[in-house]
Amino acid sequence: MIKSLLALTHQGGDTTRIVAEIQDPDNLEAAKLVGNGRTTLLDIRETVAKLVVQTSRQSGAAAVYTELFDYEGDEFYFYEDHGLAGSTYAEAQLAFDAVSVVGFIDGSVTKLNPPPSTVLTAEHTLVVIVEDDSALSGQSRSRTEPALNRLGEQLGSDEHPTQALLIGWNDRAPIVVRELDRYAPPGSTLTIVTTYGEPELPPLTNLAVTVEKAQTTSRAVLDKHVVAALDQIIVLCYDRDLDTQTADSRTLVTLLHVRDILGKVGSDVPVVSEMIDDRNRVLASVADVDDVVVSGEIVSLVVTQLSEDGRLEAVFKEILGAEGSEVYLRPAEWYVQPGDDITWATVVAGASRRNETAIGLKSPLLAREGQRFGVVVNPPKSEVYTISPGDAVVVFAED
């Protein structure tokens, strides 16, 4: 890869932007030197590991990230001629019917989910979520006023010590453990069960970790560890120790057992898994897995987006990291009072009141209407919903 970068940059006159995947993090600094400011470098291990952790924390998150990373639905774009100079960020969130304003670029600094009172200027470039950048041309202003008398609990919180189970071990696992620790409240626990590898743990602050070497396709082993009290389950593939199809086959067997056990104990804890071969993702759906992260597929989506616009690098870094604002799916009653005829503009206003940015909704009703995992991203402000207990609002929030 280093030689390829040298070949692309040695003449110096070309300003074409380059996006490169880094397999070995030891090559990162050298690649930065060769790239000479023209190259966006994507650390594959970091990207996949962080996405695994983000999606394991809440069911439906993978559907949100997939929507934001690919080109089939609504994704990130940048809006320069927005006409909102002098408006606050809270007002900007409600300004357009079919566009979700989620932040702005101020000079070289990207800010997602800024304080609602932040005043925009003509020099600010908006970060938005929209179906296509062509939809920004002549975008109509929203005429839907939020129903402020329908707002919900402003101070809702669900932070508590968590119990996580990590099945399997590979080169990305130490990063997964590190990221789990960053999100875990003090007093949380993590159990690692693996057939291969000798887990070496990073320095941890919040997690108490136990490690067991055992056969992860064994029903007896899984019966011992897959319990109703778990908050999240992650299954990693053995791509370091086995060939692709054998590793995926073992992952699928593990997933089948895990789902069967969870069904018997009456738990709906999210199960997130890696799958090396994208073709095996269809088979994984038979196991009723909430969110399957396919390493190669997600990296390809991110690389494609970055090649289109280098400004996305800062956006992706923030939403995949533990610092700044990232994706959360939180109880809808925190934002609006459950009931009929709730406009999306009202939900957006409820999120703004909590210093959060609403970008979507998760509901069983949406699942019955064909939305993947019951999740819709960037609904029109004028869209009307029936909000029920168990529904969740997708937001950008700092914690």
Give each language-model segment a name.
Residues 1-399:
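Cytosolic regulatory regions of ion transport systems
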